[in-house]
Amino acid sequence: MRFALVAAITIALLVAGSVADESSEDIDNIVIKTPLDLPRCDSPFCSLFRIGLCGDKCTCVPLPIFGLCVPDV
């Protein structure tokens, strides 16, 4: 998980750097989404019987015994 996060940030920075080299005027239009920009769920776990535990911006993904709250992207 940590390797994927570091790889995603590195690629995003490389892309931003190559775009900035082409035109310094377009640097204001670049938006880089990071995991910190994702909405946070009210709870990490949920139940199919009480779906509202995740919050408004998250969805309950069912597993055999319990569910996981996943942010809506």
Swiss-Prot record:
Top-level division of the source organism's lineage: Eukaryota
Annotated localization: Secreted
Keywords: Disulfide bond, Ion channel impairing toxin, Knottin, Neurotoxin, Plant defense, Secreted, Signal, Toxin, Voltage-gated sodium channel impairing toxin
A Gene Ontology cellular-component term: extracellular region
Secretion signal span: 1-20
A single MF term (Gene Ontology): toxin activity
Major place of residence: secreted
Annotated tissue distribution: Expressed in trichomes, that are stiff epidermal hairs located on the surface of petioles and leaves. Not expressed in other aerial parts.
Disulfide bonds: C41-C58, C46-C60, C54-C69
Residue stretch(es) of the prosequence: 21-37
Single biological process term from Gene Ontology: defense response
Domain comment (free text): The presence of a 'disulfide through disulfide knot' structurally defines this protein as a knottin.
Function, in words: Neurotoxin certainly responsible for the defensive, persistent, and painful stings of the giant stinging tree. Inhibits inactivation of Nav1.7/SCN9A sodium channel in sensory neurons by directly interacting with TMEM233, a newly described Nav-interacting protein. Has virtually no effect on Nav1.7/SCN9A function in heterologous expression systems and in neurons that do not express TMEM233. Also weakly but significantly affects Nav1.8/SCN10A. Coexpression of TMEM233 with Nav also confers ExTxA sensitivity to Nav1.1-Nav1.6.
Other observations noted: The name 'gympietide' is derived from the name in the Gubbi-Gubbi language for the stinging trees (gympie-gympie).
Similarity section: Belongs to the gympietide family.
Identification of the protein by name: Excelsatoxin A
Organism from which the protein derives: Dendrocnide excelsa (Giant stinging tree)
